[in-house]
Amino acid sequence: MKTFTAKPETVKRDWYVVDATGKTLGRLATELARRLRGKHKAEYTPHVDTGDYIIVLNAEKVAVTGNKREDKMYYHHTGHIGGIKEATFEEMIARRPERVIEIAVKGMLPKGPLGRAMYRKLKVYAGNEHNHAAQQPQVLDI
């Protein structure tokens, strides 16, 4: 018996839509990363992108436990000397709520070209509307 290896051209990708309202950030992100990698499929192959497309709605309503709403910090650097910037979870949700979920999921994906290809299949929206109706996404309950 031979080991099965998925071919990139034969992988069937589905579209799913997830509502993030009231979901805990980390628990949601782990399931999204798992599905973006394709680990839920029988034909999962580590070196091939076998994951599905995922649309996340209501990113502004994602929940965190404990004091993370005030205490969790996000950092980025502008590239200039002394250009480190920081923002709390509350500030990130107010300014760009999509980035909170994107950052959490991106950290759970592989680093390198394969991980970037997986990350591109994640579509996050702050509100309840998305422009992927033509793909006929299925509702995914996480």
Curated annotation (Swiss-Prot):
Belongs to the universal ribosomal protein uL13 family. GO terms for biological process: negative regulation of translation; translation. GO terms for cellular component: cytosolic large ribosomal subunit. It comes from Klebsiella pneumoniae subsp. pneumoniae (strain ATCC 700721 / MGH 78578). HAMAP family: Ribosomal_uL13. InterPro entries: Ribosomal_uL13, Ribosomal_uL13_bac-type, Ribosomal_uL13_CS, Ribosomal_uL13_sf. This is Large ribosomal subunit protein uL13. It comes from the Bacteria. Part of the 50S ribosomal subunit. SUPFAM superfamilies: Ribosomal protein L13 (SSF52161). Keywords: Ribonucleoprotein, Ribosomal protein. PANTHER family: LARGE RIBOSOMAL SUBUNIT PROTEIN UL13M, RIBOSOMAL PROTEIN L13. Coiled coil: none annotated. GO terms for molecular function: mRNA binding; structural constituent of ribosome. This protein is one of the early assembly proteins of the 50S ribosomal subunit, although it is not seen to bind rRNA by itself. It is important during the early stages of 50S assembly.
